[in-house]
Amino acid sequence: MNRIKEVLDRKGIKQVWLAEQLGKSYNMVHSYAQNKRQPSIDDLYKIAEILNVDIKELLVSNKPEQDTKWNQVK
């Protein structure tokens, strides 16, 4: 899973613009943003460079979040 859509929204950047900068079709970038497809590591790195963000910002952690309510009950 990736956070491309969230970063684009936060920066006010359109998927069409990213597609042009990346040299990919709008449909491909849209599928990345919707998490229907995942970009290659190379493309993810290019996207991070284009958006001027750390590549980590585009990734979703696989670690489960701690349920704070559950921890409060214990």
Place the predicted regions along the sequence by residue.
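Short, charged recognition helix plus adjacent turn
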Residues: E6, G12, S31, E49, ...
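Non-catalytic effector/regulatory segments
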Residues: L22, Y32, D43, N52, ...
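Recognition helix of helix-turn-helix/homeodomain-like DNA-binding domains
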Residues: K24-Q38
